[in-house]
Amino acid sequence: MEPAERAGVGEPPEPGGRPEPGPRGFVPQKEIVYNKLLPYAERLDAESDLQLAQIKCNLGRAVQLQELWPGGLFWTRKLSTYIRLYGRKFSKEDHVLFIKLLYELVSIPKLEISMMQGFARLLINLLKKKELLSRADLELPWRPLYDMVERILYSKTEHLGLNWFPNSVENILKTLVKSCRPYFPADATAEMLEEWRPLMCPFDVTMQKAITYFEIFLPTSLPPELHHKGFKLWFDELIGLWVSVQNLPQWEGQLVNLFARLATDNIGYIDWDPYVPKIFTRILRSLNLPVGSSQVLVPRFLTNAYDIGHAVIWITAMMGGPSKLVQKHLAGLFNSITSFYHPSNNGRWLNKLMKLLQRLPNSVVRRLHRERYKKPSWLTPVPDSHKLTDQDVTDFVQCIIQPVLLAMFSKTGSLEAAQALQNLALMRPELVIPPVLERTYPALETLTEPHQLTATLSCVIGVARSLVSGGRWFPEGPTHMLPLLMRALPGVDPNDFSKCMITFQFIATFSTLVPLVDCSSVLQERNDLTEVERELCSATAEFEDFVLQFMDRCFGLIESSTLEQTREETETEKMTHLESLVELGLSSTFSTILTQCSKEIFMVALQKVFNFSTSHIFETRVAGRMVADMCRAAVKCCPEESLKLFVPHCCSVITQLTMNDDVLNDEELDKELLWNLQLLSEITRVDGRKLLLYREQLVKILQRTLHLTCKQGYTLSCNLLHHLLRSTTLIYPTEYCSVPGGFDKPPSEYFPIKDWGKPGDLWNLGIQWHVPSSEEVSFAFYLLDSFLQPELVKLQHCGDGKLEMSRDDILQSLTIVHNCLIGSGNLLPPLKGEPVTNLVPSMVSLEETKLYTGLEYDLSRENHREVIATVIRKLLNHILDNSEDDTKSLFLIIKIIGDLLQFQGSHKHEFDSRWKSFNLVKKSMENRLHGKKQHIRALLIDRVMLQHELRTLTVEGCEYKKIHQDMIRDLLRLSTSSYSQVRNKAQQTFFAALGAYNFCCRDIIPLVLEFLRPDRQGVTQQQFKGALYCLLGNHSGVCLANLHDWDCIVQTWPAIVSSGLSQAMSLEKPSIVRLFDDLAEKIHRQYETIGLDFTIPKSCVEIAELLQQSKNPSINQILLSPEKIKEGIKRQQEKNADALRNYENLVDTLLDGVEQRNLPWKFEHIGIGLLSLLLRDDRVLPLRAIRFFVENLNHDAIVVRKMAISAVAGILKQLKRTHKKLTINPCEISGCPKPTQIIAGDRPDNHWLHYDSKTIPRTKKEWESSCFVEKTHWGYYTWPKNMVVYAGVEEQPKLGRSREDMTEAEQIIFDHFSDPKFVEQLITFLSLEDRKGKDKFNPRRFCLFKGIFRNFDDAFLPVLKPHLEHLVADSHESTQRCVAEIIAGLIRGSKHWTFEKVEKLWELLCPLLRTALSNITVETYNDWGACIATSCESRDPRKLHWLFELLLESPLSGEGGSFVDACRLYVLQGGLAQQEWRVPELLHRLLKYLEPKLTQVYKNVRERIGSVLTYIFMIDVSLPNTTPTISPHVPEFTARILEKLKPLMDVDEEIQNHVMEENGIGEEDERTQGIKLLKTILKWLMASAGRSFSTAVTEQLQLLPLFFKIAPVENDNSYDELKRDAKLCLSLMSQGLLYPHQVPLVLQVLKQTARSSSWHARYTVLTYLQTMVFYNLFIFLNNEDAVKDIRWLVISLLEDEQLEVREMAATTLSGLLQCNFLTMDSPMQIHFEQLCKTKLPKKRKRDPGSVGDTIPSAELVKRHAGVLGLGACVLSSPYDVPTWMPQLLMNLSAHLNDPQPIEMTVKKTLSNFRRTHHDNWQEHKQQFTDDQLLVLTDLLVSPCYYA
């Protein structure tokens, strides 16, 4: 790839590197380069300087005056726009000041969330290009961000509905942290570790939180001299943790993301080699591929896989370096998964595999770019020793190319493969392009497989640039271009849409890259050409032929679409969607081809298209559009030559056909006339200067045709007018050639072949701009005067009522007006007028700056825009008053109003779609390797044009003027008019206008709400609906009902509620009901808590002052006076007071609304819903609302009750009194010194946290002297720097208060809950069933009760007690659930009660719980489990000793049957699991209790015991730096179990399950006991397979031989439980992740079992092995002995006496060969061939009926083993034919006549070979000699094959 070897591409050639500060006094950080190429570039500096100065000054003042809104937001928005227009065009000093100011703003603690997001987005944008600011320039603290994340993402009040955050907030916050991370101070890492390490308790949710924090916060881009303060502090600790976790917990994936980032930022500074096998094994496991013969996936693995994107980044960063270990493993990874890419495979795992393929090359290219081409910046460069060498790149491309080529034809489409190939071809075109072409040529020939064509073409498009530019690695590339183009032509096929589109894209791509110039003459003139150049020269003679053939194809396409004449008659104006796509493809491809043609070829093409278009007459809808497009393309390329042909022709035809005046009034016009009008209107879309020659002719045509009666006719004529105006007044590039200056030079001076695939040069782009000349402008005004003026006069009179016009005439006039307006949009100055004042008071200027877009407005002429506005408004009122049903005119008026307001030469939606398509084309052809904007010239020109359009869209600013106000009001009137289509169109324009002007929504809301007022008479249903739609808004724009502003929602929300009383409201109409539903849903979805406090802290103000003082550029505005600043502060305090007043006011008005008599229930519910949004965490709800919600706990409607429950729970949280905390020193309590290094787990210094029945506090004194720690994770990993616990009872808020001691709000709640009637009613409602069988324990209700008991301690127990006793006794599902929710609330609410109160509480609860647990049923056990688990969550176990002792009394009493026992265990498990590591004593007691009961007969109890065991041993983890736990250990337990299972181990025959479920009492023998025990143990192993962190393999291995014996071989579900479980258990165990030191142990067991006398065991060893090896592939490959052992094991089992075992060994062997674990080497081949040659004993005639025949002879077994081995080798490469295969097949075929089972094996092998190789047989045939082919064909079709 030569171009990049030129130094410093992409920098203007300037001496001395960094540009000097110019006269402007500052060096911009990074401008948008495209601005320099605009035709008016020289005016931009002054413009941007002025804007920047205004932004700095006003943003600074706004902050200093404490005015966040509107001033602050207005000017930060202006700064965002500034960056979009000019890039980062400010000095480094200003850049830093902007960042610091926004950082301070974003981290204001009480900032309203929507403002926070606005500031955050801008800050992210300012920090985006991190190379612009080094760590020396900027330092940002990390704590404010942490406080924000903690407050928002881990909000304590959000779940109670006291805070409403938008969904986007999580991503914005994470991106913000990511952007600030490079600038955290050097000591940040240590501080973060100190802060979050204490959260690392692997059994607790806080672990997830800690790792999330590490992942998003830890800085990894520190310079090498600071590494000791960076990752070296945590790397060993976290990688150790990752390596030792065996089952994927959720946080493991986040660790991977962190390591990936660390690796990328520090290539060459970390030695990953020791971890590589583990990393690759885990990545392979995480793909969840189906392997092996009996597959059951661990359910855990499916959900928590790694994010492929991060895994790829990690792999890429580790590549290279001296050891090459990663490349070796990567090759191994692809070897083992390549066959999954074959198109015949499909499954849910395929997406991941495709993503891997697509991301890897992309990532490697990015790394190469960084190492070789990127401009060096302050970020640490990659050391030379670790840069990727050319060899590394070659190795990489070679290892990935096979799967990519397979993926080309994948079921999911070829997109990923094409993207991968694009990047691979940048690196190694010579390895990548030839195989792609090999697949492309046949695909272009095939007729039967069109999908192959689309797939290969899209891949060739990806590699097009690499192919065409050739370069020294792949010089022959360009020679393929012409053959490909010629062969692609048949793809232009009217019958196959997708083929047609991809062909267009293909041809367009290649034409853009190559000048289509015939250079064959150069061969005679020059003799210094290379071989390839000569070849290309002679080939280019075909270009002309290609262009002409392409045109013929297109004409064919067009003619076939004309056949659908029937559509002509119908009124469908539109083409179908597919037709319009084909039209687009055709026109853009044709225009690309002509742009790239030499003059000679162009002239031939022009003549051809002219002849075609003038010799036919086309219908104007489909075919006509396509032909006209082709003609337009031709005219655009060479206007002079083309206009000469077309204009006179069309004009003369049109003049002739309109000679007769009758034509003017015809309803239906002659086809020829229409076609010529269409053609003329399209070919005038060219360079305006060239049109001036023909102006007289064109004006004549307009005069003749603009007033045709036929709508189709005058519409085409209007198009002509529109295009003439646009062509003469707009600014646009006139050519998009791939080389500046075109190809029209003699071959002696210019050799086009040098320009094949050449990128455009940004610094010499040579854009030819069309800038309107004065002549063109005056022509445009002449057109407006001649054609627009008369229409306006007519319409003016019509609006005044002086002139009667028919509807058709009005429509015609409006059409002319609209076309004039959009034709001259950028000629007409924007609307002038008075601004609308007093909408929003502000102390800073909110002025807009006008942008210059290349034209000075001519203000001496009258402004047509204003005249149109006046006339149209008058006409509109006339039509609405007199003929509202003239909808067609109204549609046009709506369009005109929209364009008057917003159209300045380009439409926003067109701009957006062009920006999108620009990005798509850029992606499909970009060169990510060299970067530096090396795009092709046409793309660069397009990008400059987009920059110009962006400016025209922002030219106006957003000032809201009187004239805008009038027009928006007109739109509102139209939006509430009688016809739904008119309303719909008007509403869309209305929403667009609302989004365009500052603060206009506040002006318009009252007008919309007028239609909803209940007291207003005469509102029609249409107006009512229209107004509701106006409130609702569309999916993208503003929603008036929910502006985040008190002033607005104070009006809209109450209006929505009381509109229920309007007489226009009817709940019978489903459309209205749905509208209200949508409104309520949208408000709930979009509402974010609105701020009450807008104070700005001092730190912000200080930076704001600096910003105002910043020079270069600055406007010399004096600093603010102290009086002004005082006034600002005063206003700000008033604003806070206003906000509060508005808030209370809104609550009041809503309550008034909801409490109105005869308000329909729907509106009552909406009102209550809105009220519940107004709960906040910084302000208690007003008393009236509290009373309202409490009373509604007993409302009749369940919807209301549910809302009230949530609300009251929130209110109780607001009323919660704060509990005092104090700091303790844990080491003093334990009396142990602080551990010096990090040791997690049970240590002497955290022992005091454990539950210890000897020291639990049983008296008041003990209780009050204990130090309780409620949260479970403290102290496990390490102690926090500042450990706080709750202070003693006497310092806490007073309990047992009388009513007088309470606040008013509390009294309201107190009164209701002390009232027995109220409580009785409440309990009745709560114990009703909601949805049968669907109800669950409800956390909302639990929160309600927890709040009640926390805030009022035991005040309500007396009233509740009888209810609780009565509920517990009732065994109904809903009553049990109700009591469970209350009890959980009681236990958690009693956290701060005094000892006496708690003791009394447990006296009440214990009997209740005992009753409940003995009445437990299948419907309620889940609820009781949830109740106990919730009760124990985050509570100190020593405070709950009553509960634990109660639960442990006797879980398995047998009373109430096995089911109750199982449920009690479930409940107990819930409680203990919440306590994690702090109750070792209880776990030991439980284990001791359960061990004798492991032989339980009942299945449900066994399952439950298995699950409980998992939790008992959960704490026994082998994580690094963790002490052995005091809780029970697995090894000791397993040893005791093995002892009891001995009797089963020693027996050789099959173990039958002869234990009946309900067996007698008699004494059982050891085996029966053993089998029962085994069943429970299996349940335990299955339960822990996915849950525990690490598997204690060593001990469990000893159980394997037993399972091997039991597991059944056939897949049959009728087996008993024991066998099924054994099989499942083996499958789960085989997928487990092994540590390297466990490998020999496992193999030991497998080898031992392979000698077992049970063939079931030997068979199962093989299925186990398949999965185990694949799931631990690189761990095994890393251990040579292990590989030898496995090889020996499989090969020896091939000679097993049992046929099934032999066959399974063959399958296993073939699998191991296929994933490249073993290789087919000569010793193996020789071994099998020897075995095949084993002589078979002669057949003896035997007596009929003798037995001897059934046992196979040893010789037969050996011979069969050999044949199986060879068969395995054949089947191990299902998709290709390696060199050794033909001979093997011949050897196999020799055994076709051997005795069974050999013959069968050979047949099976051959039939499989045939099946897998059938698809690409043409390709595979090449590998065989002719003789071999004869034999093979014989075999594969011979009759014996079918026998």
UniProtKB/Swiss-Prot annotation:
The modification Phosphoserine is found at S1121, S1614, S1746. GO terms for cellular component: cytosol; nuclear speck; nucleoplasm; nucleus; spermatoproteasome complex. It is found in: Cytoplasm, Cytosol; Nucleus; Nucleus speckle. Residues 1-11 have a biased composition (Low complexity). The lineage of its organism: Eukaryota, Metazoa, Chordata, Craniata, Vertebrata. Transmembrane segments: none annotated. GO terms for molecular function: lysine-acetylated histone binding; peptidase activator activity; proteasome binding. Residues 1650-1738 are annotated as: Bromodomain-like (BRDL). This is Proteasome activator complex subunit 4. It comes from Homo sapiens (Human).
